[in-house]
């Protein structure tokens, strides 16, 4: 009875993990008759970084091979490029360099570094997981703005279709 809302990561991420997390959150919201707040996983990853870097931030998650989910925003969390998926190459992200540094954070940083090979990119953390601590300020803002999800129609943001491979 002490809950005012439930916040959940909406993706991108693991298909199964997103399904389980969102189903659990929706169940709590239905049972307690409280609103659901969803936060982009990539925003959660970068939220802790915004207060101590200058320049644009790219949060990313390694999907598979050289493919990454990413989101680009400035250090005030204003989105510059919505969540996308891309096969990275040495020219990826060049258009997001500003007058200040470009910061990349997320999962799969070591693979990203090998592909980009760019000395002008700052990697503040070697690997950064989505953290519930980083969700707090993002969730509070959405709660105050009454930015809630429709419990019936809300679905995870998978970004791309499910990928199956044959057993080897």
PLM feature segments, named:
Residues 11-14, 18, 45, 57, ...:
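Glycine-rich, flexible loop/turn motifs
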Residues 21-24, 89, 131-135:
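Catalytic-loop motifs flanking and including active-site residues across diverse enzymes
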Residues 35-129, 163-164:
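Surface "functional belts" at beta-alpha junctions
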Residues 1-8, 129:
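N-terminal beta-alpha supersecondary unit
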């Amino acid at each position: 009875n002490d809950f005012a809302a439930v916040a959940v990561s909406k993706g991108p991420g693991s298909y199964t993990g997103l399904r389980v997390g969102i189903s659990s959150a929706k169940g709590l919201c239905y049972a307690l008759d409280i609103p659901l707040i969803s936060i982009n996983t990539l925003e959660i990853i970068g939220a802790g970084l915004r207060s101590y870097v200058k320049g644009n931030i790219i949060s990313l998650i390694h999907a598979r091979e050289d493919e990454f989910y990413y989101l680009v925003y400035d250090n005030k969390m204003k989105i510059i490029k919505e969540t996308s998926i891309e096969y990275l190459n040495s020219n990826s992200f060049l258009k997001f360099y500003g007058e200040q540094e470009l910061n990349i954070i997320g999962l799969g940083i070591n693979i990203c570094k090998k592909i980009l090979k760019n000395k002008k990119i700052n990697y503040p953390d070697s690997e950064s997981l989505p953290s519930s601590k980083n969700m707090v300020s993002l969730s509070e803002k959405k709660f105050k703005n009454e930015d809630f999800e429709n419990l019936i129609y809300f679905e995870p943001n998978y970004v791309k279709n499910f990928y199956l491979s044959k057993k080897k």
